[in-house]
Amino acid sequence: MVLKVFFPTCCASADSGLLVGRWVPGQSSAVILAVVHFPFIPIQVKELLAQVQKASQVPVAVLGTWCHRQQEPQESLGNFLEGLGTIFSHDPWLQLCRERGTRLWSCKATYPQMSNPLDMHPEEQVMLIFYDQRKLLLSWLHPPPVLPACQMGDTTASTGGLADIFDTVARSEVLFRNDQFDERPVRLSHWQSEGVEASILVELAKRASGPVCLLLASLLSLISAASACRLWKLWPLSFIRSKLSTCEQLHHRLKHLSFIFSTEKAQNPMQLMRKANMLVSVLLDVALGLLLLSWLHSNNRIGQLANALVPVADRVAEELQHLLQWLMGAPAGLKMNRALDQVLGRFFLYHIHLWISYIHLMSPFIEHILWHVGLSACLGLTVALSIFSDIIALLTFHIYCFYVYGARLYCLKIYGLSSLWRLFRGKKWNVLRQRVDSCSYDLDQLFIGTLLFTILVFLLPTTALYYLVFTLLRLLVITVQGLIHLLVDLINSLPLYSLGLRLCRPYRLAAGVKFRVLEKEAGRPLRLLMQINPLSYNHVMHIYRLPRCGCHPKHSWGTLCRKLVFGELIYPWRQREDKQD
């Protein structure tokens, strides 16, 4: 079996010393973490490794010797390194050396505790793999996508081996917590040996994050307790709360903020990434909301919107009146049932007059309402968009009423015709068994059924025309609201922090590794460079996408068409937990 030695590139120019790392026996791999420089006291090295092993739960040990032949005499150094194997006993004992003045490397693996002196790995069987310790420490290896069963075994084995390498470097972070000003008795070389990589602003933010999170968590817990009060569960408050998109969005953001400012430490990188994505999403949402707020309050745009709202509502009502008058005549040359046509037309015209009166009654207060609604943009653009969606729903409530009236009347006739059609065929619907059974009917039942079927058939075109027109209007309103909800869901669920990491620091999101051959020479160990393969953007979106608000059900095209054909009510006034008709 080939012995694999993972060596950090930051230690390639280190002075001679000891190789400190972890031996992975199941894979015949040695992960080098640091180099201990001369001079040192062996007992102090053992104490340091015991402390690191206790803190990180990683079996760190001295795996061998490192010889960088630049200044030391070769003979004296070689004699000294040979004697270290008796002090720090480990099987296998690695002897890694970089030739003086050249780029040639040599690596041997001996087993001093074995009785057979021939138990030595030739250099051809030792593979030297270089890796970037900083990138490997900061990255997180993701599991592979679902593969066919024939490839699953090999992929799981290789992924498990890489996971051990990544996990060893990540858990050994306590070994790297020293800098060039730390006067320890043991001097190490690793990726932070030249100084700890840190930022003053980051350190200040870490210091202040604890008290700030504790304060905000207390405030959010009070708000959550107030929102969970039993008063909100009483009718009609519970009904209004479940129907308004604004309440759903505020509840969704409250859960996000409670999770972000929770004092509990993230248990794994996935949870930490989720917190970061939520924080960036909230900050972007608030920033966009403040931009919208500044735009609304500049140049008196709220007053302009209020002055334009009433004429627009009057124009919509006027167009609806013209449409109803067209339907009450002979629309497109169709022969309608005049009596039913006049009844339905006057019924809907009366509702339009009521709606116009309601709009004119509210016109003096529209500017004040819009001003207070504009202030809600400081809570985020998603809250402002949700309020805008609710305003559209309220302003088009008469269209919704027309749609409900027409849909219920059309649905009643469809189900009546289907029942009477089963009566002609000697069938009936068995409610208990949910199936159609045979049934015998009397002559009077057949006569009344025939009469009712004829009446419903002749009245169906008039009802269907009104239902078709108001359904198209309702679908137009739903399309506008759907686009608004789509934008809200995009802001809520887009993993902006993960996408930013993938763009700026792709090694942080690792999907795997690739190897590049550095040297392949007879009599020398094969030298490879391990590089991180970043996660693709599609996988980043799939793995880190945040949950949506989910306040409205999502219908498939087949379900939507079936509901439209049979006159059943559709999105958005039905919630997921509601019963179906």
Swiss-Prot record:
Keyword annotations from UniProtKB, A to Z: GPI-anchor biosynthesis, Membrane, Transmembrane, Transmembrane helix
Subcellular location, record wording: Membrane
Sequence intervals crossing the membrane: 276-298, 344-366, 381-403, 446-468, 478-500
Pathway it works in: Glycolipid biosynthesis; glycosylphosphatidylinositol-anchor biosynthesis
Pfam families referenced in this protein's UniProt entry, alphabetically: Gpi1
Oxidoreductase listed as a keyword: no
CC annotations in GO: glycosylphosphatidylinositol-N-acetylglucosaminyltransferase (GPI-GnT) complex
InterPro entries cross-referenced by the UniProt entry: PigQ/GPI1
Record membrane topology: Multi-pass membrane protein
Statement: the UniProt record of this protein carries the keyword Transmembrane helix: yes
Chief location: membrane
Gene Ontology biological process terms, A to Z: GPI anchor biosynthetic process
UniProt record similarity statement: Belongs to the PIGQ family.
Function per UniProt: Part of the glycosylphosphatidylinositol-N-acetylglucosaminyltransferase (GPI-GnT) complex that catalyzes the transfer of N-acetylglucosamine from UDP-N-acetylglucosamine to phosphatidylinositol and participates in the first step of GPI biosynthesis.
Subunit-level organization: Component of the glycosylphosphatidylinositol-N-acetylglucosaminyltransferase (GPI-GnT) complex composed at least by PIGA, PIGC, PIGH, PIGP, PIGQ, PIGY and DPM2. Interacts with PIGA, PIGH and PIGC.
PANTHER family assigned: PHOSPHATIDYLINOSITOL N-ACETYLGLUCOSAMINYLTRANSFERASE SUBUNIT Q (PTHR21329:SF3), PHOSPHATIDYLINOSITOL N-ACETYLGLUCOSAMINYLTRANSFERASE SUBUNIT Q-RELATED (PTHR21329)
Protein name, UniProt field: Phosphatidylinositol N-acetylglucosaminyltransferase subunit Q
Organism: Mus musculus
Gene coding for it: Pigq
